[in-house]
UniProtKB/Swiss-Prot annotation:
GO terms for cellular component: cytoplasm; ribosome. Pfam families: PRC_RimM, RimM. Coiled coil: none annotated. The gene is rimM. The keyword Membrane does not apply. Keywords: Chaperone, Cytoplasm, Ribosome biogenesis, rRNA processing. This is Ribosome maturation factor RimM. Residues 93-173 form the PRC barrel domain. An accessory protein needed during the final step in the assembly of 30S ribosomal subunit, possibly for assembly of the head region. Essential for efficient processing of 16S rRNA. May be needed both before and after RbfA during the maturation of 16S rRNA. It has affinity for free ribosomal 30S subunits but not for 70S ribosomes. It comes from Tolumonas auensis (strain DSM 9187 / NBRC 110442 / TA 4). HAMAP family: Ribosome_mat_RimM. It comes from the Bacteria. Belongs to the RimM family. The keyword Transcription does not apply.
Amino acid sequence: MDSSIVVGRLGAVYGIKGWLKVNSFTDNPESIFDYAPWFIMDKGMWREIQLTGWKRHNNGLICKIDGVDSREDAQALTGADIAVLSDQLPALPKGDYYWRDLIGCAVVTTKGYQLGTVSELMETGSNDVLVVQANLNDAFGMKERLIPFIDEQVIKHIDITARLIEVDWDPGF
């Protein structure tokens, strides 16, 4: 399932009738239920599942999966990632990007210095941060760079098709 994106994880069992806690990775936790079908990793393969219900419980969310009717059935699914097909995600306005689209992009300075490749992103209070794995032959001996994702000030240009991000950044940092 190459065109999928993980949007959450099944948590602990709730009750005796097969309900499971849901850890949502979406901005609005309840919006995870806007996507159907879900896919979960089961015995090394993605398996499509259907929900028969969900509800808020205390400060979290719980769901009921079709065919999962006992605590034991639910226990087998705890910790499973929840994925949806990426074409189900809403289109973003120009200049906004899903993190998954930025991971793997080459990062180059405005002066042409190859900084490395985006390996992940981190969310901070003020802005997201690109984690860039430096090239093996990095002249500054860097292994990893943390570059703030500040549009126009640091991030000068993003070309998702070419998998390239141009930044105004000192290679020594």
